[in-house]
């Protein structure tokens, strides 16, 4: 059955065109690929975002259009905290980076949070799975299955360092607890 374009537009999600957008926990954590400045502005309004966390790197090649400055500018204008926690498949996240992310997620005043990388699957998937394990008390295996189902692809050779980092940090609950 072919649905006319004007009818499809009537039922379009406000997040159409945004890569891999999903609520990890409604009102707490949302995930996606790199939003445009317009999409980010819309998300801030619709979701009442308090913090945006980018997991993208700062290399010039990774930012040909100045996405980071545009994103930071939208956040500044809207009074939203912008945090950059850059890592990639060759250089997985450090304990400090994971701890920084989890500290934000434990602070109710800094939520809701939008978490993204370029595509919204690998880097974002690792941090969302760690959120599920350390904040929502989901088993590491269940979080890994969810991460894979949402596009991580645990079998892909390129993702093995990220997968090893996930397993290490998922098992290391003691080290990632907030300091008293």
Regions found by a protein language model. Give the residues of each.
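Glycine/aspartate-rich loop-and-adjacent alpha/beta segment that forms the canonical ThDP
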Residues: 123
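Short cysteine clusters
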Residues: 117
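Substrate/cofactor-recognition hotspot
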Residues: 120
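Cys-dependent protein tyrosine phosphatase-like superfamily
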Residues: 1-114, 126-180
């Amino acid at each position: 059955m072919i649905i006319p374009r004007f009818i499809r537009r009537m039922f379009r999600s406000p997040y159409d065109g945004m890569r891999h957008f999903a609520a990890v926990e409604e009102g707490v954590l949302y995930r996606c690929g790199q939003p445009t400045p317009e999409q980010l502005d819309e998300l801030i309004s619709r979701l009442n975002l308090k913090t945006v966390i980018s997991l993208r790197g700062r290399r010039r090649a990774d930012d040909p259009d100045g996405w980071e400055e545009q994103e930071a500018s939208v956040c500044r204008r809207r009074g939203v905290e912008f945090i950059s926690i850059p890592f990639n498949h060759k250089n997985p996240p450090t304990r400090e980076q994971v701890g920084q992310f989890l500290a934000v997620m434990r602070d109710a005043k800094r939520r809701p949070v939008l978490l993204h990388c370029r595509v919204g699957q690998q880097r974002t998937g690792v941090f969302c799975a760690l959120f599920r394990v350390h904040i929502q008390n989901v088993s590491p295996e269940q979080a890994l299955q969810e991460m894979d189902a949402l596009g991580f692809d645990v079998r892909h050779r390129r993702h093995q360092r990220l997968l090893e980092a996930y397993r290490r940090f998922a098992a290391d609950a003691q080290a990632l607890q907030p300091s008293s």
